[in-house]
C-alpha cells in the first residue's frame, strides 16, 4: 500500500566489499515504519465492534472513525515532500514516529467518538508521512546491491504489521483479563493525580479496544529510538550542499572507499536532472497520460475490495455465521496470514512471468472469490438459518480473494507506478499516485457498511466481483507490460507519444 521508490539503474562497476551490519540495522529500523503502517491499518478491524458497543454508535459513525485515518494519510502524503525536504528523510521519519506514538495514546484515551475520529486523523498524518518517506529513505541510503531487498523488506513489514494487529486484537478481545490490570494501573494514575479519577480511569482501561489502539505506541517509540542512531540520507545531504558529510555516511555503509565514492558520484549526477513536477504536468500531454494511468491503477487497487476485508473482516465473518468474537478474530488472523504468505508468489514470479499475466490471474482469482462470496450469501446465508458448511465456504472465498490480491494487485500496482513516470516528473507522479491510493482507500472504508446495509451482503460482494472482471478489460486496453524493459526505454516511448499499453514491450 505504500509507494515503492525505484532504485537507480545498476552501476557498471562490479560489486565490491562485504555488506556491513549497520546496513541491515538501517533497513530493519526504517522498515519499522512499514510495521507501524500495517499495525494502524489492521488494528481497527478488531476494534470496531468494541468501539461501536462502548460508544453506542451506528454503522455510519464507525465508517467515519475507520476512514479518518485514511483521510489523514492523504494529508500526510501531501505534506511529505515539504517535510522530507526541510527536515531531511531521517528527521521526517523521527517526526512520524512521534506522531505515531502520541496519536496511538490519544486514540486509546478518546472520551468520545468525535475525539477518536480526530485522533485517528492525526495518526493518519503519521501513516502518510511514513508511507512516502520511509521507502524513499531506504532507497537513498542503502548500498545499490541490497537496495531492492531492503525496500522489499519494508513492503513485507506492512503485511506482517497487519497480521500482528489482528493477533493483538484477538488477544485483547478474547484472552486478556484486563480488569485486574486496569485496577492496578488506575490506582497508580489516581495516586499521581492526588486521588482523583480512579473509577473513570479503571473503566477506560477495562475496554479492550483502548489497549488495541494504544499498544501501537510501543513500536513507535522503538522506531524513534532506533532512528536516533541512524545517519541522514546521503542524497539529501548532497541536495543541501553537504557533500563531505554525505561521503562520510557512504563510507559507514559501503563495503569499500571506492564504492562510497562511486555512489556519491552517481548521486551528484542524478541530482543534475531537474524535477519539473507540476510544470511538466501542465506542459506535456504525454506526461499527463502517465499521471492519469498511475492514478487509475491506484483506484483499481483499492476498488478490488481488499480493504473491505482488512477493515471489516470480523463484521463480514459475523454476517457469514461466525457468531463468537473468538471465531471472528481467528478468522481475521487467518486472512492476514494468507496475505503475507501469498505476497511471496508475486516476489517469485513478477520478473519471470511479467506484470500483466500475473495481474490477469489475480483479477480472475479475486473476482472468483468475491462472486462466490456474494453467491453464498444469496444462496445460503441471507435471511435466516443455515448450517456451518456455508459459513466455511464463505471464509474459503475470502481466502481465495486474499490470495489473488496478495499475488498481484498488492505489490504489482506499486511496481507499475514506480516504472511508468519519466525521471523529471517521478517525484510528482509518485506523490499523485500515493495520494490517490489513500483517497480511494478512504472512499472504500467509509462506504462499505452503508453498502452492506443498503444492498445486502450478497449484492455488495457481487458488485466487487464484477469490478474485478472490468479491471481485466482495463488492463488489456491501457496497461503496458514492463518486464525486462529499462526505465529509459519506457520514458522514451511515453514522451514520444506511443499508446500507453505499448510503452513497455
Residue positions per predicted region:
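Alpha-helical transmembrane bundle of multi-pass membrane proteins
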Residues: 2-245, 249-251, 265, 271-505
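Short intracellular "coupling" helices and adjacent cytoplasmic loop segments at the cytosolic face
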Residues: 252-263
Amino acid at each position: 500500500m505504500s509507494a515503492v521508490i525505484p532504485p537507480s539503474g545498476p552501476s557498471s562497476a562490479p560489486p565490491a566489499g562485504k555488506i556491513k551490519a549497520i546496513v541491515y540495522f538501517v533497513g530493519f529500523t526504517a522498515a519499522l515504519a512499514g510495521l507501524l503502517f500495517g499495525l494502524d491499518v489492521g488494528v481497527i478491524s478488531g476494534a470496531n465492534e468494541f468501539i461501536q458497543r462502548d460508544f453506542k454508535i451506528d454503522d455510519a459513525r464507525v465508517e467515519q472513525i475507520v476512514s479518518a485515518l485514511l483521510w489523514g494519510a492523504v494529508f500526510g502524503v501531501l505534506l511529505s515532500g515539504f517535510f522530507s525536504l526541510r527536515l531531511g528523510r531521517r528527521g521526517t521519519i523521527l517526526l512520524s514516529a512521534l506522531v505515531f506514538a502520541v496519536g496511538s495514546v490519544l486514540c486509546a484515551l478518546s472520551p468520545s467518538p468525535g475525539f477518536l475520529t480526530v485522533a485517528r486523523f492525526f495518526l493518519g498524518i503519521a501513516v502518510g508521512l511514513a508511507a512516502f518517506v520511509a521507502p524513499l529513505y531506504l532507497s537513498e541510503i542503502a548500498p545499490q546491491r541490497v537496495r531492492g531487498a531492503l525496500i522489499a523488506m519494508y513492503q513485507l513489514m506492512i503485511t506482517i504489521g497487519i497480521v500482528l494487529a489482528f493477533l493483538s486484537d484477538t488477544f485483547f478481545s478474547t484472552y486478556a483479563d484486563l480488569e485486574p490490570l486496569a485496577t492496578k494501573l488506575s490506582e497508580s494514575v489516581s495516586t499521581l493525580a492526588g486521588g482523583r479519577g480512579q473509577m473513570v480511569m479503571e473503566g477506560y482501561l477495562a475496554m479492550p479496544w483502548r489497549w488495541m489502539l494504544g499498544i501501537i505506541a510501543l513500536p513507535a517509540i522503538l522506531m524513534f529510538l532506533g532512528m536516533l542512531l541512524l545517519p541522514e540520507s546521503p542524497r539529501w545531504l548532497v541536495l543541501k550542499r553537504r557533500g563531505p558529510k554525505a561521503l562520510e555516511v557512504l563510507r559507514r555503509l559501503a563495503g569499500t572507499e571506492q564504492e562510497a565514492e562511486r555512489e556519491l558520484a552517481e548521486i551528484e549526477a542524478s541530482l543534475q536532472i531537474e524535477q519539473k513536477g507540476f510544470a511538466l504536468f501542465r506542459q506535456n500531454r504525454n506526461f499527463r497520460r502517465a499521471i492519469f494511468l498511475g492514478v487509475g491503477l491506484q483506484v483499481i487497487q483499492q476498488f478490488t475490495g481488499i480493504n473491505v476485508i482488512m477493515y471489516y473482516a470480523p463484521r463480514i465473518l459475523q454476517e457469514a455465521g461466525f457468531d463468537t468474537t473468538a471465531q471472528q478474530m481467528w478468522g481475521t488472523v487467518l486472512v492476514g496470514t494468507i496475505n503475507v504468505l501469498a505476497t511471496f508468489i508475486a516476489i517469485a514470479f513478477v520478473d519471470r512471468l511479467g506484470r500483466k499475466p500475473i495481474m490477469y490471474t489475480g483479477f480472475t482469482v479475486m473476482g472468483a472469490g468475491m462472486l462466490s462470496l456474494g453467491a453464498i450469501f444469496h444462496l445460503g446465508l441471507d435471511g435466516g438459518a443455515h448450517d456451518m458448511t456455508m459459513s466455511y465456504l464463505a471464509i474459503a472465498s475470502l481466502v481465495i480473494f486474499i490470495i489473488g490480491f496478495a499475488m498481484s494487485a498488492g505489490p504489482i500496482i506499486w511496481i507499475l507506478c514506480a516504472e511508468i513516470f519519466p525521471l523529471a516528473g517521478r517525484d510528482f507522479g509518485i506523490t499523485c499516485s500515493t495520494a490517490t491510493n489513500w483517497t480511494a482507500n478512504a472512499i472504500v472504508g467509509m462506504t462499505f457498511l452503508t453498502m452492506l446495509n443498503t444492498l445486502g451482503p450478497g449484492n455488495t460482494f457481487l458488485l466487487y466481483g464484477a469490478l474485478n472482471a472490468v479491471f481485466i478489460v482495463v488492463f488489456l486496453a491501457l496497461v503496458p507490460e514492463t518486464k525486462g524493459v529499462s526505465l529509459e526505454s519506457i520514458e522514451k516511448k511515453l514522451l514520444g507519444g506511443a499508446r500507453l499499453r505499448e510503452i513497455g514491450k
